[in-house]
């Protein structure tokens, strides 16, 4: 029988990495939305299923990436995303990615940012701070399971996601490797 659901392993080590809360006050006062800026320029992935949607915003797209005259995200206004709930899947899924072994991890570049490096008393594990992103990937019920598993001390955690989301996660990195 065919299924549209895939189970992937979750890196417990990654889920326990602490980040400062990604809230407007912290973004404006400290990090300035640095996660939206790539070290080598704008790298916002637009998936095939998203192209028409973002072209309606008047955005230029080339080879599955947003193209900008000033190399900045056109949706970033005053350090915040002006289309937060409607942003591209690649942005929604951040800071998460799949390793080469299909394990969900935190993307390496996020550990170079202030939200990770400069711990405060408000720092929390990434599965709490970026719960919204996890819900965009897996859905609320799966994330509720993740939290239950982590809090109960379970070591080997697997969550289900749609094939569509799985391939979108894979494509996020594939497109970036091609662009480099």
Where are these regions (language model features)?
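Short loop/turn segments that flank or connect secondary-structure elements
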Residues: 1-180
